[in-house]
Amino acid sequence: MHRSGTTMAWNVFKFCTALRGLGSIMILLVLGVVGVTYYAVVLTNYGPALSQGGLDSLAALTILILFHFLLAMLLWSYFSVVFTDPGVVPPNWRPSTDEERGESDPLNSLDFVGLQSDSSSSNPRVRFCRKCNQLKPSRCHHCSVCGRCVLKMDHHCVWVVNCVGALNYKYFLLFLFYTFLETTLVTLVLMPHFIAFFSDEEIPGTPGTLATTFLAFVLNLAFALSVMGFLIMHISLVAGNTTTIEAYEKKTTTKWRYDLGKKKNFEQVFGMDKRYWLIPGYTEEDLRRMPELQGLEYPSKPDFDSQ
């Protein structure tokens, strides 16, 4: 019964192939929302307030500095997700072995027998994609939208027109983080102007600027609330070292092979260098000493198989 339910849940993803037609339209939509917001906050309301003098100018300057900083970080993170390949399986990839610890080649073990006819295996390091006709590492999944296997695939995101996987998952999380902060800021600073629409006082401005302010407030409020939900969900996934796909696959499993504790789970996504935690990038040292950032190998609990 559980197997049937899982199959029904995953059949939904066959409709994701229709997402290919969206293409760069979603990127233009994101930039359009940014443009409307920029016009409402900077050009219509708080830019002109800089010339008023006194505390009004100081407050406007503070808001504009914070707004531009968050906007810069948002766009940096966003385009990092868009233009960074999430990670693909190298040609002729084979799982590594540790001869010093007495490990044998998984391809020569009984786990590999019949692998090409069954994508599941008792050895999570040995899996086969019948669509790509190649071996794939653990935590790797085939994306029906991109038509390829993606390392540590989380999901295919229509907003970034790209898969979110091992090599750009951190950038996606930072995009959510800075989007939430930016949209929350815009909602708060435009709220007095939005409330003024429902008062009896005369509101200065042209119909165009007033409509832009109204639209920007509604859009940013909607995005702030929706992104907050996604951000909370992904914080929970990072804490358990789980992807969105894996959360569906193991929804009845209480123990998880890759859950090494919140600190190590966090570092597997954001790296060990704290200076880079809020920046869409990694240090060369982290890339060298943390192979899991490359998406091919992930440490698991030493005693997991004996539990």
Swiss-Prot record:
Keywords: Acyltransferase, Golgi apparatus, Lipoprotein, Membrane, Palmitate, Transferase, Transmembrane, Transmembrane helix. It is a multi-pass membrane protein. GO terms for cellular component: early endosome; Golgi apparatus; Golgi trans cisterna; membrane; trans-Golgi network. GO terms for molecular function: protein-cysteine S-acyltransferase activity; protein-cysteine S-palmitoyltransferase activity. The active site is at 157 (s-palmitoyl cysteine intermediate). Its main location: Golgi. Palmitoyl acyltransferase. This is Probable protein S-acyltransferase 14. It comes from Arabidopsis thaliana (Mouse-ear cress).
